[in-house]
């Protein structure tokens, strides 16, 4: 991994937060105006490529893929979404999903992150820093709790974090292409999502250890979640899971959010 490319990519994502949504889209088109495939072939990029995530777009324009780099990932999943969808008209359910994804996206971008995929009623987000990812999760947790649905229920989501090496590569065919983030870092975060209650934030020990270096106050806010977990495809290791309480009334978490 070229450290210069990684630092430039991290700066690219944070640079977008200073732009208005319209300017950010146009800037993304400019940045991703050349698409570099794993075979080294270059293609003209249409405005649709504005949907290519920021850090990924940077790698596409600066070097061949695949490339392996360290990223923080955050999975966000709307809790109890089936109930909310089946109990209201599809158009109303769509508006809820749109509002949810808009909230998640705006907060991710404000914390130097970006969206890799919207997956059903959830999203896979990535960040150059685990501290940014954790603060984004807390901000999303607070924002979602502030607006009820039309039937009076509070909207809740589940959050899972991880940090580590991720391989970025192009998938698909010549007619339809996408970019994949592959590696145990992503898989473990996806598995952990099933072990957290609505509105909860869960992370493996790796995240807490990294936060101890980068954001100590935030690391101290995490609590060990019972005994370690044994999960499918991760049977060889006992995963120590940590949860982050809601910041309401917790001065240490509120301080960590602002630091």
What is each of the regions a protein language model found here?
Residues 59-132:
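Catalytic NTP-binding/metal-coordinating core of nucleotidyl cyclase/transferase enzymes
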Residues 97-112, 124-159, 163-165, 184-186, ...:
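Alpha-helical scaffold within the catalytic cores of cyclic-nucleotide enzymes
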Residues 79, 165-166, 187, 206:
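Alpha-helix/helix-capping structural signal
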Residues 76, 128, 163, 202-203:
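A conserved hydrophobic position in a structured secondary element of the catalytic/binding core
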Residues 1-57, 198-259:
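Intrinsically disordered, glycine/charged-rich C-terminal tails and inter-domain linkers
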Residues 168-194:
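Catalytic-core segments of nucleotide cyclases and related cyclic-nucleotide turnover enzymes
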